[in-house]
């Protein structure tokens, strides 16, 4: 599918499992990692569990702040730098040129963990090319989002052979079940259906944004499968809005920290 050597791939129990393996490989008590304040929390759970210190950089206008992340990484000599693109939880997206420049400026001794769980919702030509010669970048992708196989827990990492081989030292060798493997293979072979799903998701996002617009709410241009809606208030107001929607059987989430928590998310 990617036309890359098999030994440049590692498979795990979703990206969550792979994040755990990455931290287990490289983080010892007292080591520093860098992420964004309000970013996907599971990475922080793993870092805390292995005794690492996590430096959290605030978002800049609903985007992860690439310049500030680089600065924090260099200043702290971080072992791992975590970035999601498209972003979770805000759905924003950095261009391939911006990401490539970001990658080119990562210190050699820092591992960049590029979480691309939502990359299937972006045209492949909009993504920075995968360079398997670069030894300090691992890109994580999943079958949980666009492919709809979240319950089967299939995630995978793409990177340099040497980096990928290291995962064999710590991974759960029986963690990926056979049913999940079969489903993932079949899903990859049915790209026509994936395109149908992507078109339906895009239409649904536009419909959801239009409904909220009628009531005076604005939304972000999301490059994921969810719509971030600006509540127009603070986190407490957004929480009340979320609770009301949940009571109407509309499943809604919201970011956990200010100022991101003025938004709610509808998938």
Language-model segments: residues:
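Active-site pre-lysine segment of PLP-dependent enzymes
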Residues: 48, 66-76, 89-149
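PLP-dependent enzyme catalytic core of the Aspartate aminotransferase-like
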Residues: 97, 101, 240, 244-253, ...
């Amino acid at each position: 599918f990617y036309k890359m050597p098999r030994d440049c791939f590692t498979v795990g129990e979703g990206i969550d499992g792979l994040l755990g393996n990455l931290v287990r490989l490289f983080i010892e008590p007292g080591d520093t990692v860098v992420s964004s304040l309000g970013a996907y929390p599971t990475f922080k759970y793993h870092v805390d569990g292995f005794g690492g210190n996590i430096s959290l950089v605030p978002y800049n206008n609903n985007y992860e702040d690439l310049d500030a992340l680089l600065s924090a990484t260099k200043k702290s000599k971080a072992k791992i730098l975590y970035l999601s693109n498209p972003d979770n939880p805000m759905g924003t997206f950095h261009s391939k040129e911006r990401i490539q420049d970001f990658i080119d400026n990562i210190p050699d001794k820092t591992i960049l963990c590029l979480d691309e769980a939502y990359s299937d919702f972006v045209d492949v030509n909009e993504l920075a090319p995968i360079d398997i010669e670069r030894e300090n970048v691992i890109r994580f992708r999943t079958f949980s989002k666009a492919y709809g196989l979240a319950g089967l827990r299939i995630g995978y990492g793409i990177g340099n052979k040497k980096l990928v081989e290291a995962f064999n030292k710590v991974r759960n060798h029986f963690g990926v079940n056979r049913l999940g493997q079969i489903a993932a293979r079949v899903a990859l072979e049915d790209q026509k259906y994936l395109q149908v799903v992507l078109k339906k998701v895009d239409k649904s996002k536009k419909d959801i944004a239009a409904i909220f617009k009628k009531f005076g709410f604005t939304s972000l241009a999301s490059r994921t499968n969810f719509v971030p809606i600006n509540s127009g208030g603070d986190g407490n107001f957004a929480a009340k809005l979320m609770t009301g929607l949940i009571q109407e059987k509309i499943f809604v989430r919201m970011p956990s920290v200010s100022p991101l928590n003025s938004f709610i998310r509808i998938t």
